[in-house]
């Protein structure tokens, strides 16, 4: 009797599993969009320098990063939604320093255009600047004030780095690679391997992928719809609110009180000034800070 009951139970279990599996398989058909290999253009440049798409390894590397970028859907979509907001700030600064416009895509690859981005290695801000370089570039780096999060100042620091890297390495593409691996790291490998092009250079895995990741954003921003990203004009993040600038140099600064005293709140002030990292600042050095305040805060 027990054996018969066991057989019946086993038969029921197998039948149920078969029905579940069959049902799941049937339901899955037609529910998922096809996963496609992204098309590559016939020609491509970065910063006015040709990308050798005729080389099989170059094409495969670009395809790999296109796949990675395209199929990280939520992160990539958020990055795309933010580009109009931040490119309007970044582009004039690149032009001022003579840095090619394509470097705005490097900023996308670095931080996803999130001014609050911070890496496990300690890099921070839109350009993911490390503390040592930021300090050498004249930025303040601390727990209360950290100018790596200052959109304009960090962009200027990045530009100064890139101009110097281009002068030392000879090409903008190598300068871009050095933003990840350092000028010394790239220069040493160029000498060891006897090559002059980024695309012929064997580098640590992250740096070998780095420029291709930047290129993936260039292609995607150029035509999001071609890669399956449907974004209406009204979907893009609006520019940050118009602001007025207020200078403060008090020995101690209560940022919440400062914001209220200028007709806004701490949250909105922080969004315009992400370099402010705490509620208070002990300004013993007597530095002057230019703070952006919403020109017309309708919520106050």
Q: For the regions a protein language model found, what residue spans apply to each?
A:
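Primarily a LysM-type cell-wall glycan-binding module
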Residues: 234-263, 287
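Short, functionally critical alpha-helical segments immediately adjacent to catalytic or ligand/cofactor-binding
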Residues: 99-116, 175-180, 269-272
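Substrate-binding/active-site groove segments that recognize
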Residues: 121-142, 155-158, 162, 186-189
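Solvent-exposed, acidic/flexible segments
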Residues: 76-87, 96-99, 119-127, 147-155, ...
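Catalytic and binding regions of secreted/periplasmic enzymes and modules that target cell-wall glycans
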Residues: 162-189
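Hydrophobic h-region of N-terminal signal peptides that target proteins for export
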Residues: 10-18
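Extracellular LysM carbohydrate-binding repeats and other cell-envelope/extracellular binding modules
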Residues: 268-300
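An acidic, Gly/Ser/Thr/Pro-rich helix-cap/linker signature
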Residues: 4-5, 17-98
């Amino acid at each position: 009797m027990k054996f018969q009951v066991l057989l019946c139970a086993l038969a029921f279990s197998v039948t149920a599993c078969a029905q579940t599996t069959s049902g799941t398989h049937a339901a899955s058909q037609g529910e998922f969009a096809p996963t496609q290999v992204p098309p590559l253009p016939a020609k491509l440049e970065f910063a006015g320098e040709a990308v050798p798409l005729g080389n099989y390894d170059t094409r495969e590397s670009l395809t790999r990063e296109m796949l990675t970028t395209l199929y990280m859907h939520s992160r990539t979509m958020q990055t795309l939604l933010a580009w109009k907001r931040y490119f309007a700030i970044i582009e004039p600064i690149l032009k001022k320093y003579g840095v090619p416009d394509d470097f705005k895509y490097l900023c996308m690859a670095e931080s996803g255009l999130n001014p609050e981005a911070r890496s496990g290695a300690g890099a921070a801000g839109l350009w993911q600047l490390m503390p040592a370089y930021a300090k050498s570039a004249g930025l303040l780096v601390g727990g209360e004030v950290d100018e790596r999060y200052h959109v304009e100042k960090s962009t200027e620091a990045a530009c100064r780095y890139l101009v110097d890297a281009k002068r030392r390495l000879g090409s903008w593409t190598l300068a871009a690679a050095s933003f990840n691996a350092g000028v010394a790291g790239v220069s040493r490998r160029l000498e060891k391997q006897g090559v002059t092009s980024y695309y012929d250079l064997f580098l640590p895995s992250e740096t070998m992928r780095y420029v291709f990741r930047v290129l993936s954003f260039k292609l995607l921003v150029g035509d999001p719809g071609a890669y399956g990203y449907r974004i209406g004009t009204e979907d893009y993040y609006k520019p940050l609110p118009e602001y007025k600038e207020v200078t403060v140099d008090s020995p101690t600064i209560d940022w919440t009180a400062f914001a209220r005293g200028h007709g806004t709140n701490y949250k909105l002030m922080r969004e315009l000034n992400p370099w402010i990292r705490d509620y208070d600042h002990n300004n013993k050095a007597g530095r002057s800070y230019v703070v952006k305040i919403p020109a017309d805060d309708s919520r106050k």
